[in-house]
């Protein structure tokens, strides 16, 4: 169900961007990685999880809520005036 829901969000993003573009309404989606919220750290950040992050994430830092907020602010700003129909991945380079 998770993968299906993600695909639906991507499809909806593209369809709405196409439909609303003539009105200069931009539609994008953000795809966050494993954000270090208090809940994530309390419930799921185990030593094995830490190792997985170290092995799979290109950047050494941990993804913080502020990293996601900065992307949202960019998308809301005039700096992203020509960005639409896109998936903005904020995940520290997860591979």
Question: Would you name each region that the model predicts?
Answer:
Residues 2, 10:
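Catalytic tyrosine of NAD(P)H-dependent dehydrogenase/reductases that use a Tyr as the general acid/base
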Residues 5, 13:
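Active-site helix of classical SDR
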Residues 6, 69:
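Conserved catalytic core of two-component sensor histidine kinases
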Residues 18-22, 81:
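Alpha-helical segment proximal to the catalytic Tyr-Lys
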Residues 22, 34-57:
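A glycine/serine/threonine-rich, flexible loop-to-helix segment
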Residues 26-36, 76, 89-91:
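Conserved SDR Rossmann-fold cofactor-binding beta-strand/turn motif
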Residues 57-68, 79:
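A conserved structural motif in NAD(P)-dependent oxidoreductases
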Residues 73, 84-95:
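Short C-terminal tail/terminal secondary-structure segment
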């Amino acid at each position: 169900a998770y993968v299906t829901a993600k695909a639906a969000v991507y499809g909806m993003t593209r369809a709405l961007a196409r439909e609303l573009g003539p009105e200069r309404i931009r539609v994008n989606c953000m795809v966050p990685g494993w954000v270090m919220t208090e809940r994530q750290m309390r419930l799921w950040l185990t030593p094995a999880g830490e190792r997985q992050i170290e092995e799979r994430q290109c950047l050494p830092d941990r993804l913080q809520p502020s990293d996601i907020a900065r992307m949202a602010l960019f998308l809301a700003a005039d700096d992203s005036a020509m960005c639409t129909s896109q998936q903005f991945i904020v995940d520290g380079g997860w591979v």
